[in-house]
Every structure is written in C-alpha cells, then in structure tokens.
A protein has these predicted regions:
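Walker A (P-loop) phosphate-binding motif
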Residues: 49-105, 225-226, 393
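Short, flexible loop segments at boundaries between secondary-structure elements
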Residues: 254-256, 308-312, 355-389
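Residue-level signal for inorganic ion chemistry
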Residues: 40, 80, 113, 172, ...
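Acidic beta-strand-to-loop metal/phosphate-binding motif
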Residues: 335-343
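Short helix-loop-beta junction
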Residues: 92, 115-120, 294-302
C-alpha cells in the first residue's frame, strides 16, 4: 500500500507534459484509472456542495466563533503547525480554544499538538463528526458568549480570563469539512510545490478546483523561505486571479532544537549535527522541506529515506533503515545519526528506540515571516477583524 501511495504521489506532483519522459511504465499504467477517478471526483464535489446550498445537508453552527485552517492540495501545507500557532494566539489572550481534528494517520498530529499545548487551557477534540465532538466538549466545559469575549482587545496585550470555558473552535483541515459553518477560512499553500500538477485528486493533488480560492479569507504561503521571489510571485498571481482582495501572509517551520529518542526530556542544540553523518527518515507530506532544513545546519553528509505521508514504521522498515545506517557507517568510517520529524516520532515512538544508533527528533514551530508588509501582528489583526465582522455586529 505504501508503494502504491508513493507511485500516486509521484504522478500527482509531475506535470502531464513530463509524464512520458520521467515516469516509469508502472506509473504510466496507473494514469488511465486515475484519470477516470479524477473525472468522477469533480461532479461529486459539485453535487455535495449543491446539497449544502439547497439545505438538504445541514451546516451546523457552533455557539462560538470557528476558525478553519485548510488547504487546496493535500500534504505538507503546514495546517497543523498553523492550528497550534492560532491556538497559542487565543491562549495568550486568555481565551481557551477547542481544536477539532479528524485524527487520522495514527493520530501523529494529535499527539504532537497534545505535547506542544500541554499545560495550556487548549482542548483537542478528535473524531470525524466534529460537530458532535464539539457538542460533547461544550457540555463538559461550557462556552463563552462570543459577544462578550471576542472584542477588539481579544488578541492584544490586554488579556482576559475565561476560566475553562471554550471561547473559540479551530477546525483542523477544515476547508472541505462543509458540515461546520466557519467565521474565517484560512487556506495554507506549500510554496515548494503549491499546486502539484494542477489536476484534481487522485490524478493530481488538488482537493478542489482553483475556484475554491474564492472562499478564502486569508491565504498563508508556507515554507516561503524555500521558494524564489519569482515562485512567490507566481503563487500570489494564482491566488489573486481567483480572489483579488484576499490578504496573503508567509510562514516558515522554524527549527528550534532536537530531542533524543529514549530520553525526550533532554534537548540538543541544532549545532550538534554540524559535521555529522545523517540519515533523514520521514513519512510526511513535504519531505523535501525537512531535508533542506537539515542541510542548512551544516552536516557533513545527508542521506534520506522517504515514506508516504502518515506511514507507520513497521519492523521491515526498521530493517531497511538499519541497513542504510550500516552502509553509511561503512562508507564514511564514522557512526551516523538518524533524524526524524516530531510527526514521525509521535506516530510510533517505541519502534525507534532499538536501532542501535542515535536518533534525534527535530522540533520546530511555525513563524509568520515579516514579508511584503505583513507580519505576525498584522496576521493577528486580520484574524481579529474577521471575527469581529462575523460575530460582533
């Protein structure tokens, strides 16, 4: 299954004009089936949206404001780091947020959020029926009347205390989750590969047509430091083609330190891998960004093993990893280290503890870049204004 997922991902990220010259016969044999599925996907999307527009499917309204964080394409767009960033904005303002997430893929993202937000009043509700999950949390903790809490000072330095009651809901991967009404739609775009091959799933990476950008209230271009000025301009042009007035912000996933597998309470500075022999192992949506960031830290050599997004490491995978580490040790006459992301570690931490090699976990956090007149404060102001527009009339 993992091999099939990798094949489909390679097709989805390859321009059709290059298929014949770059893809293997096995890849090419899948294209007719994927094309058929993709042609059926669009009318299914339209039909579903039409059911909501006609009221045949009901859109549920929560008693608190809802911030949706989603994307137009799958994989590596920084949704979960942005969810955490927004949650911290509200926590710092004294408003306990409720994060609503599906929790698929071994719940690696849920575990990471739980660790990062531990000790804060943020709550994490997990399940496909996020309206029902939210209802359970509202009954358990209560909620704050938004007209009394989300005023102009909410995201400023003058904090208010709301106890344990929920003041806002943050919808993780919410763009296609039409069941919940939202106050603000934040759309994440991966600057390194923004639109894949411009085709719909499963032949491409698009979960909706480009016209869906019209629904965006805010667009965040993630991994913005890894794209050229021309690439950033091309992304801006595409976004503004469908949504002329939408504000665009830029973010990065900034590394802070490493933790050691087997002793995660011990942190290591980033400089610890300078001049080291490394094997980067990941099962995330944007492995290239991970490897490039490791390269910037100055190791002597970087090798990589990529698995499909959310892949759970099995014993056979550990054997492959161990053999690659043995080879690196033989080639360089030095003991290599393995580096993984937090998502990979939290998916199955126990399988990484007995490799016989040191395993480091790269810890990072999302930051809004000061770029093109936008920065973290202007993003918070934009968020605040949208919540005021929709809830405080």
């Amino acid at each position: 299954m993992d091999k099939l997922a990798r094949l489909v991902t390679q097709i989805a990220n390859s321009p059709p004009s290059q298929w014949l010259s770059t893809l293997s016969p096995l890849h090419l044999s899948l294209i007719p089936l994927l094309s058929l599925a993709s042609s059926l996907y669009l009318p299914a999307l339209h039909f579903r949206r039409r059911l909501y527009a006609l009221g045949l499917l009901r859109q549920h309204r929560l008693p608190v404001p809802v911030v949706s964080v989603g994307n137009l394409t799958w994989g590596g767009n920084g949704k979960t780091p942005m969810v955490e960033f927004i949650a911290r904005c509200f926590v710092d303002s004294g408003i306990p947020p409720l994060i609503l997430t599906r929790g698929y893929g071994g719940e690696d993202e849920v575990k990471m959020l739980e660790r990062h937000l531990q000790g804060t009043p943020a709550k994490i509700g997990v399940g496909a029926n996020r309206a029902a999950i939210a209802s359970i949390y509202f009954q358990r903790y209560g909620y704050i009347d938004p007209r009394g809490s989300l005023n102009h000072e909410t995201l400023s330095s003058e904090n208010i205390s709301c106890g344990d009651k929920i003041g806002v809901a943050i919808l993780d991967d919410g763009m296609q989750h039409l069941r919940l009404w939202r106050n603000i739609e934040i759309v994440m775009v991966n600057a390194m590969i923004p639109w894949g091959n411009h085709l719909l799933l499963p032949l491409g990476t698009l979960r909706e047509p480009f016209s869906a950008l019209k629904r965006a209230d805010v667009v965040i271009v993630h991994h913005a430091d890894m794209a050229s000025k021309l690439e950033i301009q091309a992304i801006e042009s595409m976004v503004h083609k469908y949504n002329e007035s939408v504000p665009i912000f830029f973010s990065i996933l900034a590394p802070s330190h490493f933790i050691r597998v087997g002793n995660i309470s011990y942190t290591c500075p980033l400089k610890d891998i300078s001049h080291a022999i490394l094997l980067c192992v990941s099962a995330i949506g944007s492995a290239d960004s991970f490897v490039q960031r490791i390269h910037k830290m100055g190791p002597m050599h970087v090798d990589r093993l990529d698995f499909s997004d959310h892949h759970s490491f099995q014993p056979k995978d550990i054997d492959i990893i161990r053999k690659r580490l043995h080879k690196l040790e033989s080639d360089f006459s030095a003991v290599p280290m393995m580096v993984v992301t937090e998502k990979d570690y939290f998916r199955r931490p126990e399988v990484l503890e007995h490799l016989g090699y040191e395993v480091l976990v790269l810890c990072s956090s999302l930051q809004i870049l000061p770029l093109k007149g936008c920065n973290e404060e202007s993003f918070k102001k934009c968020l605040r204004q949208h919540l005021e527009i929709y809830n405080l009339a």
